[in-house]
Amino acid sequence: MLVLGIESSCDETGVALYDTHSGLRAHALYSQIAMHREYGGVVPELASRDHIRRVIPLLEEVLGKAGATRADIDAIAYTKGPGLAGALLVGASVANALAFALGKPLVAVHHLEGHLLSPLLEADRPEFPFLALLVSGGHTQLMRVDAVGQYTLLGETLDDAAGEAFDKTAKLLGLGYPGGPAVSRLAEFGNPGVFDLPRPMLHSGNFDFSFAGLKTAVLTQVRKLNLTDSETCYQPRADLARAFVDAIVEVLVKKTLRAAREHGLKRIVVAGGVGANRQLREGLNAEGKKRGLRVYYPDLQFCTDNGAMIAFAGAMRLQADPAQVQDGYGYGVTPRWDLEDIRIRHA
């Protein structure tokens, strides 16, 4: 079965073809980072317009790479939500039009499910059940995953997501857009232990997160030491970035390992843009190894939004239960969507 996947939830336009027999056939991605950089963040209207410009050329590129035609497509998957409403509508419109014209099944995919299942694209893939840490610009969640469509929320952020905290800290430190990678790069040159930042909710007794207080602590230090001059204050800013990354990684690592232990899970999946962070990967790998846990990640190119994860998630849903996941034709999108709402009833 050859499944076309279309991703357009925010500022990346992604298209891919996934074959349930041979794996990922082809994928293409266009990032809008350069366009949004001058505004310091994503401008929804500009994002939507750019998706319109890019999606069809990307579709043709992917078909060419795969040596396939539109007639070869067996099903079409698209991101229905969560995300920016206008951006989602672009992908939904193209997917619906293609599915209707070709008479093919249409699968609405939850964006976070795409991230959650993306490590299964790798040759060394985890078996169910596993614990998933979803860390991105808009979400920070711990999920128990028993099968495709069987997700149990164990904990989530009560305010800022981890990626959002990275982006806001980048602005406080006068770094560029996108902020997450900029903070991580600066932190590489920082000295540990110079600043003592809080570890919010580290000992809360549950698996929820909170990063707003950590961001405020960074702001306090920036104002106290007047760290706004990127030229004369380089080392103190690097030290503060290091303290921020150390704090956020410690919270993510310890809560994830605690959740795995308490739920008897030996496999951990890390997905989402923050999952590309080197410090987070090293921390989870080292501490997980001590406890006999395996930690799995998607390829770095699939940590951020992409069409491959949507094509794959759509294919997995169709295989799990075609009758229940087929979406019919319609242009509705769901900008706010709970992952637990998409459960598949397994026999």
Swiss-Prot record:
Main subcellular localisation: cytoplasm
Protein name: tRNA N6-adenosine threonylcarbamoyltransferase
Catalysed reaction, written as an equation: L-threonylcarbamoyladenylate + adenosine(37) in tRNA = N(6)-L-threonylcarbamoyladenosine(37) in tRNA + AMP + H(+)
Organism: Ralstonia pickettii (strain 12J)
Enzymatic class: transferase
HAMAP family (alphabetical): TsaD
Similarity annotation: Belongs to the KAE1 / TsaD family.
Function: Required for the formation of a threonylcarbamoyl group on adenosine at position 37 (t(6)A37) in tRNAs that read codons beginning with adenine. Is involved in the transfer of the threonylcarbamoyl moiety of threonylcarbamoyl-AMP (TC-AMP) to the N6 group of A37, together with TsaE and TsaB. TsaD likely plays a direct catalytic role in this reaction.
SUPFAM superfamilies documented for this protein: Actin-like ATPase domain
Cofactor(s) annotated in UniProt: Fe(2+)
GO MF annotation, one: N(6)-L-threonylcarbamoyladenine synthase activity
NCBIfam families per UniProt: gcp_kae1, T6A_TsaD_YgjD
UniProt keyword annotations, A-Z: Acyltransferase, Cytoplasm, Iron, Metal-binding, Transferase, tRNA processing
BP-aspect Gene Ontology terms: tRNA threonylcarbamoyladenosine modification
Any one GO CC term of the record: cytoplasm
InterPro entries, per database record: ATPase_NBD (IPR043129), Gcp-like_dom (IPR000905), KAE1/TsaD (IPR017861), TsaD (IPR022450)
Encoding gene, per UniProt annotation: tsaD
Cofactor remark from the record: Binds 1 Fe(2+) ion per subunit.
EC nos: 2.3.1.234
Residues that coordinate or bind substrate: L134, V135, S136, G137, G138, D167, G180, N277
Binding site for Fe cation: H111, H115, D305
Entry-linked Pfam families: TsaD
Subcellular location(s) per record: Cytoplasm
